[in-house]
Amino acid sequence: MGSHPITQDNDLDPPTEPGERYFNRELSWLAFNDRVLAEACNDSYPLLERLRFLSISGSNLDEFVMIRVAGLVGQVQRGIDEVSDDGRSPREQLNAVVARLEELSERQQDIWRNLRVQLADAGVHVADEERVNAEAYGWLKQHFFESILPLLTPQALDPAHPFPFISNEGLGLLFTLRRGGEELVEMVLIPSALPRFIRVPGEDALYISIESLITRFAKELFPGFEIVGDGTFRVLRDSDIEIQEEAEDLVRTFRSAIQRRRRGQVIQLEIEEEFDPTAEALLREKLDTPGATFVKTDGMLGIAGLADIVDEDRPDLKFDSYSPRYPERVLEHDGDIFAAIREKDIVIHHPYESFNVVVDFIRRAAIDPDVVAIKQALYRAGTQSEVVDALVEAAENGKSVTAVVELKARFDEEQNLYWANKLERAGVQVIYGFVDWKTHAKVAMVVRREEEGFRTYCHFGTGNYHPITAKIYTDLSYFTADPRLGRDAAKLFNFVTGYVEPRELEMLAVSPIDLRETIYAAIDNEMVNAQAGKPAAIWMKMNQITDVDMIDRLYEASQAGVEIQLVVRGICNLRPGVPGMSDNIRVKSIIGRFLEHSRIYAFANGEPMPGTSSTVYISSADLMVRNLDRRVEQLVPIDNQTVHDQVLQQVLLANLLDNEQSWELQPDGSYFRVEVGEKSFNCHRYFMTNPSLSGRGGALEAGAVPKLALRKGAV
């Protein structure tokens, strides 16, 4: 992998048919989940970590059904015949997706059966009825009567009783009862407050699923009846929220929309393979909505529920614990984050470096008497947020505090409404941004009174201000006191709070204004350099790439001889390695202990890559239409040389060199694991064992970080 163009046969005409140029977005998303599922079979991982990947794959598929499948069902029902970028109608996509979902679901069950045996061998027993001895039975019975039975409400399904509402992701049981020659069907919905698995006390772990526990003691629910059949079912509903642009009260509109989502159209009804026929017929009749799919599962319903078992206290079955580092540069200044930033820009690489640095940035601003103003954009902040607490404290301390709270963050709408209300009560000026655009930018600014006048300190991130995801997502936090970026950040906030379109930005690019054009210009510059015989290369790292105009621009660059290396964790509509179209493009995906989430865009700029002259950006945006045209995002150029070296020659290069947890995308859409070869390299392990460049401070001279170098054949 050098920086010089690769020659190609320019006599070949590039493909013109959509299906030959682009992959289908939905199928590419499912291919990502297939790679996640493959980690559940990774023998090099501890057992409970493999179970975690299986659980994540289940959660991913649930969300896919609730959002993407629901969207396709809606298009089919409305008669929409607009084709996708790869030329498929909604009906064709839906058929392909449903077939692929069936394959993935069957594979999940096969993997679960295998893992269940291995877990039992390791002393973790799940749904193993043979291990329920007299002592365990006694404890389970007492637990059922004390903690389960009071929460259950059996409901008869007959003309005298309305059919009960089953909430989204609702899990329930149907029992066919008999007494005096008459049959009756009863439904028991399992409250979401109950855990999916109950652990029986004991040295060896024994977990019993909530549905099997209720079934075991069902006679206590129906005294005097004979139970002649039973079965477990699960419902997934349309969970997307659509907000009309003319909405007058955004908060009230979202509260109503959240209520509607709970009652969205049924998209999938999942039942056990051995479901009672009488109960099944009734359930189908009552839930037979147009477009709903019925799935019979030979195994566990709602495999995401296995997350309960991952919490088992067995360190020997999990990854070795890891404690993130706190940057030495900040410690050298006795924890004064502002002094550390004044000395030099810093980039923090999460989760290898502590998210507490970000929290401390806001917390210190809240109590610093010289800080006069704080502005913060919040997209996802979690259920417990020290950042929100610090903003509240700042407002209570008399500082001017502005928070942009995005209500349209999917599945976090209700939590964000809560945070907005808490912030407003404390005196924070809360802004909800645009009705038709999401504010996805990750930015905070602090204005501080100093001897020379007011100075602005900024934080730009690639990830959310979320304490939980910051422990498992790889992201970058860039701290700077560069006055140019401070002025740009102020204009960005004014854009969101007052709709004042930023003009004459000095460094930042902002979508939907000029972020797309900034990346276009950088790609075009590489084409000019390639045609002039100069080194020309593009390295990009992102979560997804689906924007066809951006993909076409990269195809043009490939045809011009620009070498392009993409690290795309998830959806990739770009088809690499196609003669005459994308010969010079290679795409890889990294799936490992941590979830790759940072976005980095780098361009050779006429010199061999990686080099000091390379143009490097970090961003909140992926290369998707929504990020480039329908969201407020930021693209931040990296000028500081130490930070530049860290982002390009440490973070991005390590991702390209990784061969232990990497998959390479083939021209036909399949992914193959990258061969380790003579020298193995795991980028997650490298970051866990080597400190970053910009955060080391004076310690950098005492102990240099091992320098990475390109090697031939690396992706």
Curated annotation (Swiss-Prot):
An intermediate of this reaction is the autophosphorylated ppk in which a phosphate is covalently linked to a histidine residue through a N-P bond. Its EC number is 2.7.4.1. ATP binds at N60, Y473, R569, H597. GO terms for biological process: polyphosphate biosynthetic process. GO terms for molecular function: ATP binding; metal ion binding; polyphosphate kinase activity. It is an enzyme of class 2 (transferase). Mg(2+) binds at R380, R410. Gene3D superfamilies: Endonuclease Chain A, Polyphosphate kinase middle domain, Polyphosphate kinase N-terminal domain. Its cofactor is Mg(2+). The active site is at H440 (phosphohistidine intermediate). InterPro entries: PP_kinase, PP_kinase_C_1, PP_kinase_middle, PP_kinase_middle_dom_sf, PPK_C_dom2, PPK_N_dom, PPK_N_dom_sf. GO terms for cellular component: polyphosphate kinase complex. Keywords: ATP-binding, Kinase, Magnesium, Metal-binding, Nucleotide-binding, Phosphoprotein, Transferase. It catalyses: [phosphate](n) + ATP = [phosphate](n+1) + ADP. Belongs to the polyphosphate kinase 1 (PPK1) family. Catalyzes the reversible transfer of the terminal phosphate of ATP to form a long-chain polyphosphate (polyP). This is Polyphosphate kinase. The gene is ppk.
